[in-house]
Amino acid sequence: MRELYKNTPAGLCGNEDCGQMSAWYVFSAMGFYPVCPGTDEYILGAPLFKKATLHFENGKNLVITASDNSDTNRYVDEMRVNGTVYTKNYLKHNELLQGGTIDFKMTDRPNMQRGTQESDLPYSFSKDEKVK
């Protein structure tokens, strides 16, 4: 994201299809993105910023922090939602609209133990026994 997107006339990679590339960038920079349209899940990534605040129409705010984020600390070691450890690899739309805090603890190595339970997997990665 730091290499392909810049604040210049040619700062977007590819074609800006009706704002989709910009929307992808904004969501991804916050650390999550709606990968599977039609679901209420946002898949986790790694935030670009150390802090971002979303102000919702309902008057609530969502503060997203990744204070130890850097070019080398680009992996999520731990995540807390409203102070509670959060192991899922997705966030739900209604949870975001409630406001509160999302704190990413970033590290220079992937945490291979985080988010490995079946309940931590998002819809788009779930196993469907009907599909063969």
Label each PLM-derived region with a short phrase.
Residues M1-K132:
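Non-catalytic C-terminal accessory modules of carbohydrate-active enzymes
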